[in-house]
């Protein structure tokens, strides 16, 4: 069986999840990966057969999106051409992690697909939302990458078709310890802005992961680290707590480890506002932006008790098994053909 796995690379979380899922997917057949986007800073060992700039989100230095850069990189002509060229018809199963070009290709070629990931959970109105819903944000969540079928992941099973997060095997196998430091990953804030706040709580040690350094450096109570999946995982396992955005993968892993968590959602990104609402229901402090006295919030939060660890109803193996069963139900009785020459339209 041939499987196309389309992965959104607008952030590191999608990449991390794909790396974790790949060995399980490969038990069912040959897996080719379509990597779309250019805002992930993690090196990847994924078997990338097709690669595109996709539609990427870019962040500013003070907690929000960089709309100008996003507009500069956007090309509807390129997206249309790549969707026409992507050979989705050559695969038995198409699994889509919120990737718009694959979704469009499946529409053009009448190919069934399954959306598997966190964004699929927002097909349900029972998934938490902020007090003020945004029409455009809701439309994007439900229409940016449509599929034939949906398999959602979230912090809680809010509805049928929504399941627990995929947690990395290294984290599941780990014994969490508390070595006193706080692990920090805030891709939407600059090193300078983060440093200004963390230096004001000298009694707490921080391990900050940022794209702005290539080697480990220490500045007073802050250890700056280059972005690394293994390094970040180890730091989080050994931390007293985690400060991060209101994405999905990192907060889910921190909650699974029973770590204290404080989240700063990316301004203007509706999905993160939805996640923030869900995290607040779980008792996680959410700070709308890094204000002038954020360091005071950190000091108070650091002394709070750790939460009860998040429980998983299904293992990664079981989740993939369910996804494949759901995807197989979409398969036509006829077999797929051979790959065509449209691969030349994609950069590898």
Question: What does each model-identified segment do?
Answer:
Residues 251, 255-306:
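Catalytic binding pocket for nucleotide-activated donors in carbohydrate/polymer assembly enzymes
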Residues 124-190, 211:
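A nucleotide-sugar donor-handling region in carbohydrate enzymes
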Residues 94-100, 105, 115, 235-274:
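A donor-sugar binding/catalytic signature common to diverse glycosyltransferases
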Residues 64-93, 100-101:
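Conserved nucleotide-sugar donor-binding subdomain of glycosyltransferases
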Residues 166-241, 291:
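Donor-nucleotide binding loops and adjacent catalytic segments primarily
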Residues 14-26:
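Short amphipathic alpha-helix
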Residues 8-12, 30-78:
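Conserved nucleotide-sugar phosphate-binding/catalytic loop shared by glycosyltransferases and other
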Residues 299-348:
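C-terminal amphipathic helix plus adjacent low-complexity
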């Amino acid at each position: 069986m041939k499987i196309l796995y389309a992965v959104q690379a607008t952030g590191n979380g999608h990449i991390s999840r794909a790396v974790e899922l790949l060995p399980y997917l490969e038990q069912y057949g040959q897996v080719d990966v379509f990597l779309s986007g250019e805002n992930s800073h993690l090196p990847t060992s994924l078997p990338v057969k097709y690669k595109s700039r996709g539609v990427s989100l870019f962040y500013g230095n003070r907690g929000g999106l960089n709309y100008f850069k996003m507009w500069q990189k956007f090309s509807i002509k390129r997206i249309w051409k790549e969707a026409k060229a992507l050979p989705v018809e050559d695969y038995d199963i198409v699994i889509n992690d919120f990737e718009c070009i694959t979704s469009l290709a499946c529409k053009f070629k009448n190919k069934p697909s399954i959306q598997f990931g966190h964004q699929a959970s927002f097909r349900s109105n029972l998934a938490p939302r902020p007090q003020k819903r945004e029409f455009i944000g809701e439309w994007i969540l439900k229409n940016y990458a449509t599929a034939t079928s949906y398999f959602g992941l979230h912090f809680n099973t809010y509805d049928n078709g929504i399941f627990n997060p995929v947690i990395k095997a290294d984290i599941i196998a780990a014994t969490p310890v508390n070595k006193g430091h706080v692990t920090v990953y805030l891709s939407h804030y600059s090193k300078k802005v983060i440093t200004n706040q963390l230096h004001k709580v000298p009694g707490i040690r921080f391990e900050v992961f940022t794209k702005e350094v290539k080697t480990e450096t220490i500045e007073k109570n802050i250890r700056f680290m280059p972005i690394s999946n293994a390094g970040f995982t180890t730091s989080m396992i050994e931390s007293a707590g985690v400060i991060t955005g209101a994405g999905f993968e990192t907060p889910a892993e921190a909650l699974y480890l029973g770590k204290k968590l404080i989240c700063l959602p990316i301004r203007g990104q509706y999905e993160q506002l939805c996640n923030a609402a869900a995290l607040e229901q779980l008792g996680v402090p959410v700070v709308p932006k890094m204000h002038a006295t954020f360091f005071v919030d950190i000091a108070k939060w650091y002394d709070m008790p750790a939460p009860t660890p998040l429980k998983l109803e299904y293992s990664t193996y079981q989740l993939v098994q369910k996804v494949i069963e759901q995807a197989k139900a979409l398969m036509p009785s006829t077999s797929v053909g051979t790959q065509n020459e449209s691969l030349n339209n994609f950069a590898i």
